[in-house]
Every structure is written in structure tokens, then in C-alpha cells.
Amino acid sequence: MAAKMKKGSLVRVIRAQLENSLEAQASDRRLPDYLFHSKGEVLDLNEEYALVRFYVPTPNVWLRLDQIEALA
């Protein structure tokens, strides 16, 4: 999946992967709806994470690559 992911890619969050993650368990479990019902854009990548911008007035967020999928 990481091979398909590049800067500027449009992505969506995989609900099951994010809700069951260690990161979600370590913080507030009430995740905002926009994460699952809107597209995000990859701004930056490293080996395990992608910096994703959603088109709502919120900060960008780092998500693991297995928690997002590229849109066709």
C-alpha cells in the first residue's frame, strides 16, 4: 500500500484500523466524524506515517499508513 501512497494523494481513514489502534486507546476514544466521512490529502510521508490534511478547519494529523487507503 505504501507504494501507492505519495504526496498529494487523496486518502480516506479506515475506521477499524484507527479505532483499534494503540494511538486511539491512549487518547480520547471519541473520534470526530470528519475523519471517516471526508477525504484527506497526504502532505508528507515517512516510513510508517503520513501527514494528512482534511478540508475542515482542524490541524493536520499524522496517521499510520495502515490506517489510511488511497482513493481511486
UniProtKB/Swiss-Prot annotation:
Listed GO cellular component terms? Answer: plasma membrane-derived thylakoid membrane
- Looking at the keywords, is NADP present? yes
Disulfide bond sites: none
**Location of the protein in the cell:** Cellular thylakoid membrane
Instruction: Give the membrane topology.
Output: Peripheral membrane protein
| Principal cellular location given in the protein's record | membrane
Q: List UniProt keywords, sorted A-Z.
A: Membrane, NAD, NADP, Plastoquinone, Quinone, Thylakoid, Translocase, Transport
Tell me its EC number(s), please.
Answer: 7.1.1.-
Please name the top-level EC class of this enzyme.
translocase
**Quaternary structure per UniProt?**
NDH-1 can be composed of about 15 different subunits; different subcomplexes with different compositions have been identified which probably have different functions.
Q: What does this protein do?
A: NDH-1 shuttles electrons from an unknown electron donor, via FMN and iron-sulfur (Fe-S) centers, to quinones in the respiratory and/or the photosynthetic chain. The immediate electron acceptor for the enzyme in this species is believed to be plastoquinone. Couples the redox reaction to proton translocation, and thus conserves the redox energy in a proton gradient. Cyanobacterial NDH-1 also plays a role in inorganic carbon-concentration.
Q: Which family does it belong to?
A: Belongs to the complex I NdhO subunit family.
Q: What is this protein called?
A: NAD(P)H-quinone oxidoreductase subunit O
Q: From which organism does this entry originate?
A: Synechocystis sp. (strain ATCC 27184 / PCC 6803 / Kazusa)
